[in-house]
From Swiss-Prot:
Cofactor binding note: Binds 1 Zn(2+) ion per subunit.
Domain of life of the source: Bacteria
InterPro entries documented for this protein: DNA-dir_RpoC2_beta_pp, DNA-dir_RpoC_beta_prime, RNA_pol_Rpb1_3, RNA_pol_Rpb1_3_sf, RNA_pol_Rpb1_4, RNA_pol_Rpb1_5, Rpb1_funnel_sf
Keyword list, A-Z: DNA-directed RNA polymerase, Metal-binding, Nucleotidyltransferase, Transcription, Transferase, Zinc
Protein name (database record): DNA-directed RNA polymerase subunit beta'
Keyword Zinc annotated: yes
Single GO BP term: DNA-templated transcription
Coiled-coil annotated spans: none
Length: 1317
């Protein structure tokens, strides 16, 4: 090996091991690693390296750096307090300042270690690659830096200390946010990463190297992967381990490398030196059926030689992409465009000198994100700096569009002055709109200064007030009182008030009036209407273990109280019910009305009787059975005595004729109709209808006279027909119920309340009551009725039930009252925002008051003396009042008259008279004095800068409390690439999900026309090559990424936002399909989508510092882009909507072309990895992945066969897998390999291994030199050795290798000696 005269740090160590591995194979590489380990341990032990607290040396410059940063931030805070910059600009400046300081300090830490203590153990540890890296060491000896809060917003208070100095309590709390987030993320990450790996393995498990060369002419164009100025992956790195698809020709025409040459590191560097782009073989362009060929895959990175046949490259690819998943952060903090390192490069003046602008440089004035004025470059040009003196040096900076200039043409600059920020990226940075709330720091009165508000109405009709022109919002200090609802101020503007004087008062008013009842000191009840049953007593009785209230009336009637005392009763509810058995029947039966009339409706509560009469009741006994007909013991029409068993275990209670109701052999009911039964009566001789009522004394037929009221019914019985005379019972119903009704006593506000007694029937005319025991037919009830005056709604009213003690008769009476309850405000000594309040009661218990009377008054008192301000005239309700106190004024003594006028607004730091600066901002009230003794009286105030377009939450003259939101600042910030990052982004790409805000792509090449309209929107048109003009509408918030007159290609992004891979595929396909036909267009579209996916996945991994070879991603992407969707089957057997492999369709279409039939038309599709797994040819593999039932059902219905081509299917079935050693047996079965008879297996003879004592003579082999200078044999050398042998004849093999036993002198002191060594 070569001698390297370097300090071997982490990066070099990696390279060294890689080199040894590639050149000398795994066994010797691991031996080298072991020896390096031994070496390290030996010297570490000798040196006694350890890390102690003393090794954490903090750079002495830290103090000055922090002081400088704090000074800069103080200046920024002062500018903010003076209203020169907005809250957003202040925040941005603070963040950037601390960030810069933290970075500088980190660099200083390294410089400090190198200069003062290069053998410092912390420094050695970090740079040797043992443990830790710079970002961790900087927390130990630099500063911990800025942290994000749980919402991902950066806290503008940095952690200035490091772990060596120790954190303050505040810093510790801030620091723990991020720490917790890290732990939680790690826990969530492992699961996501595992699932991603599983999906990847599933989609690519059947990709196996099955052939040597597919012979494709297609190739992949490879260039270095860049981002702005940074090279993410160099061309040499991307070429390494691939095979060329086209010859590489140098600038002078010489061929550097030919097609199908393998590119090793040296060749990669040579190629990268002469060209920027190379065409290589790639799995994406491989035409091998269902696999990848050796030449397209290239080297197996495991051993740095061409991949073997039968290698399961799919699984290797899946594992390679899935494994680093845990290292990717779930979501990096959404930092709000903070880290400016990537966006712009700052150029400072090297020494004192002057600057000049180059020719053609055109700029426009802008305000930077720190609120400074600068010039933004629109047309690129140069900035020239020239030092002082005759032989002064000059330096030229080329400025790209978008760069910021902080110096004017011809200005003199001092050393270290910031001259320009050069924008790095070629394209314009995409920006997004963000908002930030600004809250007031003090209470007071709002005053707009040079601020022009305008109202905007959106489509929903909501109005927002927006600052059309930026300006200042001032808050003039004062104490603001929040008035409670309904309070009215009793003071006027400019009135002087003292402590405790009344500022406002609220009145508590009754709506209905009535009798006052004081319940507690917080609540007043007013009885608006009441009713008392003064003739009746209420007693508590217990019956059947339950206590109930019973009302005894003067007529000795007993009513059961249905509502408990203390509860509310709604209008029309039943309060009590008469206890009465007169209307209760003994059995079931049928009811008929005779002269009784009822009111309409009211089925729920019963039917109210409006006119009295008689109820006729025809008894019958009904048993509901619902059992099998076989259990019936009696017959239909049979006469039974009381106590007869009619059905098993059911006995009848009365004698009579049986009627059986049955349906579908189920016995539903048995009805027993009591009465006198006359058999063998001839219907012809008797003039009586069935159902006719017979009066007492009426003759039925000779010998039979009716004694009571009866009903006749003809019956068919088993013994013959007969006449049944059924008894009829009569119940008398009165017109009016016997119970008393009672009206209300006091009726304030025209309300009346009444207890009305009503009679209600439970059944209507003709109802049958199915029962054995009997049922009540009529009930007398007391019902609550509330009447309102006029048209006021009373449906919502309810009454309270109360029991009143009667002193004289020692019993309780029932009273119903309608109450209005009023709650008094609590007295407050001092509410922080509302002032002290006192409540006075203006009524006594028992007072009778009219509606609208004032019951109580609450007074709000001043806490301090002052002048009243801020009451707006003509406003309906006044919610806030301002008091200007002595503390809100500021008096400044001046030696001479200041040049200010009353009413003028002054900001802090303003010079009043020479030598006197104002300490606080304020509004001039008055100027007093003469000669050299002047007094300036100010009202303290605070300005807030508002940028144009901000949303105003306040109006001029409003009163605000401290902490109220004043405005919502709307600002643009550079979109940071870290919004979706890490695993979620990888998943989004591999699952081919559509991004939330996709960019607009050009559908054809042409020249852009970009027009910026009045309302800040952008209009983009593209004049295509054939002259058509296409318009591309932009969504709100999208920014144009092209400039006017720019030439663009198909698929170029016109706006910012993420690319949608589906759209890329669609745009390319639809553009090329008419030109080149389906197949070529599909290839072009898929190729564009493939290139995008590979690069995007690489970008994510690179941003996390993970190196993955392109070929792994390509294998996965190949699986995602293999299929097309059939649009029209033509004359083929394929169905529309079917997903088929592109190669397969093309073969069928070629055949169709030969026979002249119609080919199939199709659209290429991009499938996410889950979809692709479920759409494989193998249903066993798909079913074992997800949706097992669905996949298997469909496979069964379609009669699919599984050819067991992948690994998974074979594992599930339990066969040898078709990879590795199982590859050849499978391929012969499938007929993919022609068996070669000329190659027989060779027995590998032992290699001559010269011992260390003898001089190793190089063994000569005609083809390839195999050096066997030690006894370490590994896979690489065995492969090389086998390779040399297969090309020799047997004799040569035997001649060249002298297999003499003496040479194997193993027990000598070889490298693997005994322990004593």
């Amino acid at each position: 090996m070569t001698f390297y005269n370097y300090t071997i740090d982490k990066g070099r160590l990696k390279k060294l091991i890689a080199l040894a591995y590639r050149r000398y194979g795994s066994a010797r590489c691991s031996q080298l690693a072991d020896e390096l380990k031994e070496l390290g341990f030996r010297f570490a032990t000798k040196a006694g390296v350890s890390i102690s607290v003393d090794d954490l040396t903090i750079p002495p410059e830290k103090k000055q750096m922090l002081e400088a940063a704090e000074k800069e931030i103080r200046t920024t805070e002062e500018r903010y307090a003076r209203g020169e910059i907005t809250e957003v600009e202040r925040f941005q400046k603070v963040i950037d300042t601390w960030n810069g300081t933290s970075e500088e300090l980190k660099d200083q830490v390294v410089v400090n270690f190198r200069k003062t203590d290069p053998l410092n153990s912390v420094y050695m540890m970090a740079f040797s690659g043992a443990r830790g890296n710079m970002s961790q060491v900087r927390q130990l000896v630099g500063m911990r830096g800025l942290m994000a809060d749980p919402q991902g917003e950066i806290i503008d208070l940095p952690i200035k200390t490091n772990f060596r100095e120790g954190l303050t309590v505040t810093e510790y709390v801030i620091s723990s946010y991020g720490a917790r987030k890290g732990l939680v993320d790690t826990a969530l990450r492992t699961a996501d990463s595992g699932y991603l790996t599983r999906r990847l393995v599933d989609v690519s498990q059947d990709v196996i190297v099955r052939e040597q060369d597919c012979g494709t002419e297609r190739s992949l164009r490879v260039t270095a992967m860049t981002d702005g100025d940074q090279v993410k992956i160099s061309l040499a790195d991307r070429l390494f381990g691939r095979l060329l698809a086209k010859d590489v020709v140098g600038p002078d025409g010489e061929i550097i490398a030919k097609r199908n040459d393998e590119i090793d590191e040296a060749l990669a560097n040579r190629i990268a030196a002469v060209t920027d782009e190379v065409y290589v073989r790639s799995p994406l362009t491989c035409e091998a059926a269902r696999s990848v060929c050796q030449n397209c895959y290239g080297w197996s990175l495991a051993h740095g030689h061409k991949v073997d046949l039968g290698e399961a490259v799919g699984i290797i690819a899946a594992q390679s992409i899935g494994e680093p998943g845990t290292q990717l952060t779930m979501r990096t903090f959404h930092t709000g465009g903070v880290f400016t390192g990537e966006v712009a490069r700052q150029e400072k003046a090297p020494e004192d000198g002057t600057v000049k602008w180059g020719k053609g440089l055109s700029t426009r004035k802008v305000r930077t994100r720190h609120g400074e004025d600068a010039e933004q470059v629109e047309i690129a040009g140069d900035l020239i700096w020239k030092g002082e003196g005759k032989k002064a040096a000059t330096q030229t900076y080329s400025l790209t569009p978008g760069s910021l200039l902080f110096v004017q043409d011809g200005q003199t600059v001092t050393a270290g002055q910031l001259m320009t920020e050069i924008s790095l990226s070629k394209t314009q940075r995409s920006t997004e709109r963000a908002t930030k709330d600004v809250a007031g720091d003090l209470a007071g009165e709002v005053l707009f200064d040079r601020l022009v508000p305008e109202e905007k109405t959106d489509r929903q009709g909501n109005t927002t007030r927006i600052a059309q022109r930026g300006g200042l919002v001032w808050i003039l200090s004062g104490e603001v009182y929040n008035l409670p609802p309904g309070a009215e101020p009793v003071v006027k503007n400019d009135e002087q008030v003292e402590v405790g004087s009344i500022m406002a008062e609220t009145k508590l008013v009754t709506n209905d009036g009535g009798v006052v009842r004081l319940v507690s000191n917080r609540e007043i009840e007013i009885i608006t209407a009441s009713v008392l049953l003064d003739q009746a007593q209420v007693k508590l009785e217990s019956s059947g273990g339950r206590e109930q209230y019973v009302i005894y009336t003067a007529d000795k009637q007993r009513f059961l109280l249905k509502a408990a005392p203390g509860t509310k009763v709604q209008n029309h509810s039943i309060v009590a019910e008469l206890i009465d058995d007169r209307y209760r029947t003994t059995t079931g039966g049928m009811i008929r009305y005779a002269g009784v009339e009822v009111a309409k409706g009211g089925r729920k509560q019963g039917y109210e009787v409006t006119k009295g009469g008689t109820l006729l009741w025809i008894p019958e006994e009904t048993h509901e059975i619902n059992k099998d007909i076989s259990l019936l013991i009696v017959e239909d029409g049979q006469y039974v005595e009381a106590g007869t068993e009619v059905v098993k275990d059911i006995f009848c209670q009365s004698s009579g004729i049986v009627e059986v109701v049955q349906k579908n052999d189920i016995l539903r009911e048995i009805i027993i109709k009591p009465g006198d039964f006359y058999q063998d009566v001839d219907p012809g001789s008797v003039k009586i209808e069935s159902g006719q009522l017979l009066q007492p004394g009426q003759d039925v037929f000779p010998g039979v006279t009716v004694s009571t009221l009866s009903q006749a019914e003809w019956i068919e019985s088993p013994e013959g027909n007969g006449l049944l005379l059924r008894p009829v019972e009569e119940y008398k119903v009165f017109d009016e119920p016997a119970a008393p009704s009672q009206g209300s006593q006091n009726e304030e506000g025209g309300r009346q309340i009444e207890l009305r007694s009503v009679q209600r029937l439970f059944y209507k005319d003709g109802d049958r009551v199915k029962s054995v025991e009997g049922a009540p037919l009529l009930s007398t009830q007391l019902v609550l009725e509330i009447y309102g005056s006029g048209n006021e709604g009373i449906s919502h009213l309810s009454a309270d039930i109360e029991l009143q003690d009667d002193e004289e008769e020692d019993c309780q009476r029932l009273q119903l009252v309608i109450l209005e309850s009023l709650v008094l405000r609590r007295d407050q000594e001092s509410d922080p925002l509302g002032g002290a309040s006192k409540t006075r009661l203006l009524v006594q218990d028992g007072d009778q008051i009219p509606p609208g009377a004032v019951v109580a008054r609450t007074e709000i008192q001043c806490k301090e003396a002052g002048t009243v301000r801020g009451i707006k005239e003509g406003q309906e309700s006044i919610r806030r009042v301002l008091l200007e106190r002595a503390a809100d004024r500021l008096v400044v003594d001046l030696p001479s008259a200041p040049e200010v006028k009353p009413g003028q607004l002054l900001v802090a730091g303003q010079e009043l008279v020479p030598g006197v600066k104002l300490e606080e901002s304020g509004k001039v009230l008055e100027i007093n004095g003469k000669g050299d003794n002047y007094q300036l009286v100010l009202r303290r105030a605070r300005p807030y800068r508002v940028s144009p377009g901000a949303v105003l939450h306040i109006e001029d003259g409003d009163l605000v409390q401290r902490g109220d939101n004043l405005v919502l600042l709307v600002f643009e910030r550079a979109k940071t690439g870290d919004i979706v990052q890490g695993l979620p982004r990888i998943e989004e790409l591999l699952e081919a999900r559509k991004p939330k805000e996709a960019c607009v792509l050009a559908r054809a090449p042409g020249v852009c026309q970009v027009e910026y309209l009045e309302d800040e929107s952008v209009d983009i048109k593209v004049v295509e090559d054939d002259g058509t003009v296409s318009e591309y509408p932009l969504l709100p918030g999208q920014n144009a990424m092209v400039t006017d007159g720019q030439r663009i290609d198909v698929g170029h992004a016109l706006t910012d936002g993420y690319n949608n891979p589906h759209e890329i595929l669609d745009v390319f396909f639809s553009y090329y399909v008419d030109k080149d036909g389906c197949y070529q267009a599909a290839l072009r579209g898929l190729q564009a989508a493939q290139k995008f996916l590979v690069n995007e996945v690489q970008t994510v991994y690179q941003s996390q510092g993970v190196d993955i070879s392109d070929k792994h991603i390509e294998v996965i992407v190949r699986q995602m882009t293999a299929k097309v969707r059939i649009d029209d089957g033509g004359d083929t057997t394929m169905l529309p909507g079917e997903l088929v492999e592109l190669r397969q369709v093309e073969q069928v279409n070629e055949a169709m072309g030969i026979t002249g039939s119609a080919p199939a038309r199709y659209t290429p599709v991009l499938l996410g990895i889950t979809k692709a797994s479920l759409n494989t040819d193998s249903f066993i593999s798909a079913a074992s992945f997800q949706e097992t039932t669905r996949v298997l059902t469909e496979a069964a219905i379609e009669g699919k066969s599984d050819w067991l081509r992948g690994l998974k299917e074979n594992v599930i079935i339990g066969r040898l897998i078709p990879a590795g050693t199982g590859f050849s047996s499978h391929e012969e079965v499938l007929g993919l390999i022609e068996t070669q008879d000329d190659i027989q297996g060779y027995m590998i003879e032992p290699i001559e291994l010269p011992t260390t004592k003898k001089k190793a003579s190089a063994t000569k082999v005609k083809t390839k030199k195999v050096e066997a200078d030690d006894d370490l044999l590994d896979d690489t050398r065995a492969r090389a050795y086998a390779g040399t042998q297969l090309s020799q004849d047997d004799e040569e093999f035997e001649e060249t290798y002298d297999t003499d036993e003496d040479d194997f002198d193993m027990d000598d002191d070889d490298d693997f000696g005994d322990d004593e060594d």
